[in-house]
C-alpha cells in the first residue's frame, strides 16, 4: 500500500512544462558570452547554433524577426554576446535559449557596461528632464570642447560662420579618444566653468565605432557634464550614435553640425524677419495714413457744407425763389382782375343802359384804382420785408463782421481763442480778416490786469 502522504507524481509532459515555466519565470532574460558552433540557417530564415566555452555548451535559436536586426553574419568559432531568454523544448525535454539580440563579444561587453552605467545614472536622477538647464537664446559666446584636429570642430566652425559670423567661439582642445580622453574632457568642462567665458558648451566629436566613442560613455564625463553650471549640448558621432553623455547633457544634437545650428542664430532668417516686420509696418502706416486722409476729407467736406458763404448762398436762393413766387402771384391776381373786368364790361354792353354804364365805368375805375393801390402797397411791403431780411442776414454774417474790421484768431488745433491762457509762447496762430488770413507766431503773452476797486 502507498503511504498516506505520497509524493507528487508528474507525467513527462507536466514535468517538462513545469521546468519550462520555472526557467522562463525565475531566470528571465540573461546576457551570455560564448563561441558559436554548428551554425545553420534553414529555409525558414531562423538561426540555430550552439554557444560553448571550454567546459560546457547550450543549444540556441534566434528567430527571423530577431536576427534581421543583427548587423553582421555570425561565423563558426566567433565570440559573441547575446541577450536571451531561457526555455525548454517540451517535446524532447531539450533545454535551450531563445536569443533576442547578438553582438560581437568586444562590442557586446562594452554594450553591457553601457547598459549598466545607464541604469545606474538614471536611478540617481542624472537623466531627469526637470534638472535640464535652458539654453540661452540667443547665445553670446559658445565654447567647444573637442579635438582641435578633428572634423567635428571644422563642421561646427563652418556652420557658426555661415549662420552667425559675429558669434564669439572659444575652443577648449582635448583628446576625445583613448585612455586619457575622459579625464581631459572633464578638465575642459571644469576649466570652462571656472573661466565662465561662455553661456553654452558643445561637447562632442565625429563618428566612429563603439570603442572610438567610449570616452563619452565614461562615468566621469557624465558626472562632469551633469555638474556643469553652463548648459551643455552633446554632439557625439552620427544621429544613430547615442552615448551616456547624450542622456546627461541639457540637450542632445544628432551631429556636431546640428549642435552648431542649435546654439546659433540664423542671421539670414533674422534679416528676413526684420524685412517682413518692416513690410508689415509700412503696410500698417499706409493703412493708417489712408484712414487719416479719408477722415480729413470727410471733415473738410463737412466744414465746407457749414461755411457761412455757402449758407448765405442757400438763403439767397431761397429769397429768389420766394420773389419769383410773389411775382407770379401778383401777375395771376392782375390777370384774374382783368378777366373779371372783361366779364363785367360784357354784361354792361349787353344791357347798354348809358347811366348804368357810366356809373359802372366810374365804379370800375375806382375799383381799378383801389386794386392798383392795394397791389402797389402789398408789393412795396413785400419788397421792404425782403430788403430787411437781406440786411439782417448781411448784418449777422461772419464775413460782414470781418469786413467791419474785426478778426477771428484760432490756435494750431483750430480752436478759436477766447482767453490768453489758451496761448503759449512759440505757438503758431491763424488770424482770419475780412480779406484774407494772417499766420503769426506768439513771442509773448500778457494778461491784462483787472482794475482795482476804489474804497
Curated annotation (Swiss-Prot):
Any one annotated GO CC term: exodeoxyribonuclease VII complex
Enzyme Commission designation: 3.1.11.6
Pfam family, one: tRNA_anti_2
GO molecular-function term, one example from the UniProt record: exodeoxyribonuclease VII activity
Highest taxon in the source lineage: Bacteria
Reaction equation(s) it catalyzes: Exonucleolytic cleavage in either 5'- to 3'- or 3'- to 5'-direction to yield nucleoside 5'-phosphates
Cellular compartments annotated: Cytoplasm
Keywords of this entry: Cytoplasm, Exonuclease, Hydrolase, Nuclease
InterPro entries: Exonuc_VII_L, Exonuc_VII_lsu_C, OB-fold_nuc-bd_dom
Disulfide partners: none
Chief site of localization: cytoplasm
The keyword Cell membrane appears for this protein: no
GO BP terms, alphabetized: DNA catabolic process
Recorded family membership: Belongs to the XseA family.
PANTHER family: EXODEOXYRIBONUCLEASE 7 LARGE SUBUNIT
Subunit text: Heterooligomer composed of large and small subunits.
Function per UniProt: Bidirectionally degrades single-stranded DNA into large acid-insoluble oligonucleotides, which are then degraded further into small acid-soluble oligonucleotides.
Protein name per its UniProtKB record: Exodeoxyribonuclease 7 large subunit
Organism in which the protein naturally occurs: Escherichia fergusonii (strain ATCC 35469 / DSM 13698 / CCUG 18766 / IAM 14443 / JCM 21226 / LMG 7866 / NBRC 102419 / NCTC 12128 / CDC 0568-73)
